[in-house]
Swiss-Prot record:
Heterodimer of an alpha and a beta chain. This is Pyruvate dehydrogenase E1 component subunit alpha. It is found in: Plastid, Chloroplast. InterPro entries: DH_E1, PDH_E1_Alpha_Subunit, Pyrv_DH_E1_asu_subgrp-y, THDP-binding. It comes from Pyropia yezoensis (Susabi-nori). Thiamine diphosphate binds at Y83, R84, A132, I134, D170, G171, N199, H268. The gene is pdhA. Its cofactor is thiamine diphosphate; Mg(2+). GO terms for biological process: pyruvate decarboxylation to acetyl-CoA. Pyruvate binds at H57, Y83, R84, A132, I134, D170, G171, N199. It catalyses: N(6)-[(R)-lipoyl]-L-lysyl-[protein] + pyruvate + H(+) = N(6)-[(R)-S(8)-acetyldihydrolipoyl]-L-lysyl-[protein] + CO2. Its EC number is 1.2.4.1. Keywords: Chloroplast, Magnesium, Metal-binding, Oxidoreductase, Plastid, Pyruvate, Thiamine pyrophosphate. GO terms for cellular component: chloroplast. It comes from the Eukaryota.
Amino acid sequence: MSYPKKVQLPLTNYNSTGLNLNKSNLLVLYEDMLLGRNFEDMCAQMYYKGKMFGFVHLYNGQEAVSTGVIKLLNPTDYVCSTYRDHVHALSKGVPSKNVMAELFGKETGCSKGRGGSMHIFSAPHNFLGGFAFIAEGIPVATGAAFQSIYRQQVLKETEDLRVTACFFGDGTTNNGQFFECLNMAVLWKLPIIFVVENNQWAIGMAHHRSSSIPEIHKKAEAFGLPGIEVDGMDVLAVRQAAKQAVQRARQGDGPTLIEALTYRFRGHSLADPDELRSRQEKEAWVARDPIKKLKKYILDNEIANIGELNEIQNAVKTELEQAVKFAISSPEPNMSELKRYLFADN
């Protein structure tokens, strides 16, 4: 049996036309990606020290996708994630100390210690949560986009449409909920961006072996929405694609499907020895580290100097050290509230 070919490197190059990024914008992107990477590295340390339990899925290598999309959104916009949700939450503005406390199972966690790694949630930040099963977040995100349309068209509220960014992996795109929600979003012109983080592997199944059409963005054509393929290792390329999608959604023109070609630098979870991917494949993708790529862009174009970038790195390190101290010192959930939040109050 022959399978379609795998994604070939290098991917498309970034075209800067129309982004209008200044120094402040670029440093925000750089800091956000650094925060995500260092947060995940700290999670690995804490997990192996026995401070975290259960499955922990890290996001190393995929930071350009989260940062490139979410940093374009307004605070009132929505984000829906997967079980690999820590960095999406950070990009949406959930404080790192509350995400870390959640991973420690503490009362000060953003889900009161009840969600853990796979169920990060924050209502104040319109972060709709992570989901342990693939595709389960897509209907929730579609519902969030629907209520935005409903508020404007039925309740006659005057605010701009709120955009929903829905993240999921390549393995999800063979699930029926993916197709059903694409269809519904187009029918109702919902303000939603479907972001496929195609990291080439669904646990141990290579994507090119599991789909008759591995080019996921091409599936959009069947439903009548734009499908964009983008280099998910380049935050500026992702931001450019996301900018088009956000504008389209906010002005009421409907959804967009973005396929970001990316790669996770660690195994599927911290329990995965990562023996199925070849060393050559991993090295080829690691050489395209999105953080190093943006750092080089900033330095080569003399947007900031190495001292300024080191200051950002040190600030991130300090923030995460404080986040761990906060998580360790925070109280455990009270046993008397064990059954709280299972049902709606009143």
